[in-house]
Curated annotation (Swiss-Prot):
InterPro entries: dUTPase, dUTPase-like, dUTPase-like_sf, dUTPase_trimeric
Keywords: Hydrolase, Magnesium, Metal-binding, Nucleotide metabolism
Name of the protein this chain belongs to: Deoxyuridine 5'-triphosphate nucleotidohydrolase
Reported function: This enzyme is involved in nucleotide metabolism: it produces dUMP, the immediate precursor of thymidine nucleotides and it decreases the intracellular concentration of dUTP so that uracil cannot be incorporated into DNA.
Binding locations of substrate: R64, S65, G66, N77, T81, I82, D83, M91
Molecular function via GO: dUTP diphosphatase activity; magnesium ion binding
EC number from the UniProt entry: 3.6.1.23
Source organism: Leptospira interrogans serogroup Icterohaemorrhagiae serovar Lai (strain 56601)
Family: Belongs to the dUTPase family.
GO annotation (BP), single: dUTP catabolic process
Cofactor(s) needed for function: Mg(2+)
Catalytic reactions of this protein: dUTP + H2O = dUMP + diphosphate + H(+)
Gene that encodes it: dut
Pathway: Pyrimidine metabolism; dUMP biosynthesis; dUMP from dCTP (dUTP route): step 2/2
Length: 145
């Protein structure tokens, strides 16, 4: 699939698969200088990239597992959704859950990008559902787990 990408900064790096069968493309920080993320704070990290996502798709932005577990750095709105009609710079929000400052440097792999199919619903309003299920309207904790 071809997806058009604009480099908004000359030092921006394209998304990269680390293995042939990886689902997520690594996204890199695009910085002119180091960014210090203090404990408990969220910072928006620029990628220097803008995308023209085909209409029937969207991107999901997720944490990289090693980056998150080793550094206690998370994406607070994970998974983040990038809609096909957005043309601005891809910015990655990072939350520092650690006890000390974390330094983000240019080129650091900070997130994963997944390409997802977008489904559009044709909502039909009904007064009741035609089928009944064993669970019914039982919600939180109703299955005992």
């Amino acid at each position: 699939m071809k997806i058009f990408v604009q480099k908004l900064r000359p030092n921006a790096e394209l998304p990269l698969l680390q293995t042939k069968q990886a689902a997520g493309y690594d996204i890199h920080a695009c910085l002119d200088s180091k960014l210090v993320l203090e404990p408990g704070n969220v910072g928006l990290v620029p990628t220097g990239l803008s995308f023209a996502i085909p209409q029937e798709f969207h991107f999901e932005i997720r944490p990289r597992s090693g980056f998150s577990t080793k550094n206690r750095i998370l994406i607070p709105n994970s998974p983040g959704t990038i809609d096909s009609d957005y043309r601005g710079e891809l910015m990655i929000p990072l939350l520092n859950l650690g006890d000390s400052s974390f330094i983000i440097e240019h080129g650091m792999r900070i997130a994963q990008l997944l390409i997802r199919k977008t489904w559009y619903a044709d909502w039909e309003l009904v007064s009741e559902f035609a089928d009944r299920t064993e669970r019914g309207a039982n919600g939180f904790g109703s299955t005992g787990h």
